[in-house]
Amino acid sequence: MESNHEGNAIQVIDQVTTMTHLSDPNPKTKPGMMLMKQEDGYLQPVKTKPAPKRPTSKDRHTKVEGRGRRIRMPAGCAARVFQLTRELGHKSDGETIRWLLERAEPAIIEATGTGTVPAIAVSVNGTLKIPTSSPVLNDGGRDGDGDLIKKRRKRNCTSDFVDVNDSCHSSVTSGLAPITASNYGVNILNVNTQGFVPFWPMGMGTAFVTGGPDQMGQMWAIPTVATAPFLNVGARPVSSYVSNASDAEAEMETSGGGTTQPLRDFSLEIYDKRELQFLGGSGNSSPSSCHET
């Protein structure tokens, strides 16, 4: 019994000694040992986790043009590629796209002249290698026939403008407005407008508009065919138009066939005559020689 008590005492002493050593660990001899306090009051050693490995900066991917580039595609195309990936059992969508490109090789060569191999890759002894400098075409960038290699494709015209040199887009080759029977403004005289060339209306304050300031701009139309003259005014010197207001009005009334009011509206000479009379005061005191015949 005594031996058992002695053995238990020695064991307790050893445990106390061990806890004493663990309570004050030497960081130089045991850098990985730490103390953690538990609810029962005992201190237990805990090992620290190893530091995570740093990721290598070495790029293991093949350097080609367009690597890591996002490609936008319509929703229908993306859904179809995803469906083919599941149906063909491929691991990724990129493998499915590669499968599609391999099947479409003849059409690609026919359209572009090159295959699915990257443009910068060069086959050396059966292996593809990336050159450090861009390839230079022989004969100054020309092929065997001497013509420049055309790599651009014809695209549909998405512009809102039309090329004026393209004859298929213009129906009028002269550059003028087409002659059509259009009714611009108000037809005062009820004249058939078939075959007339429309003119833009002129605003107020121009020399071509007759009438008072309260009237709107008028529209003139010139017939394109040889018909009866619309304004039958004989060829006379300019000075004779401003000789007498009554004579000019009478001549315009007789030449118009009874339609006095419309002819007065189109009379430019009478309007200029009256302006000169207002500026000169009276016909006798006017310094100008507008009354001379």
From Swiss-Prot:
Start and end residues of each stretch annotated as Disordered: 45-67
Disulfide-bonded cysteines: none
GO molecular function: DNA-binding transcription factor activity; transcription cis-regulatory region binding
Localization in the cell: Nucleus
Predominant place of localization: nucleus
Domain of life where this protein originates: Eukaryota
Pfam families tied to this protein: TCP
Basic and acidic residues bias: start-end ranges: 56-67
Domain TCP per the UniProt entry, residue ranges: 57-111
Protein name from the UniProt record: Transcription factor TCP19
Annotated organism of origin: Arabidopsis thaliana
Record gene name: TCP19
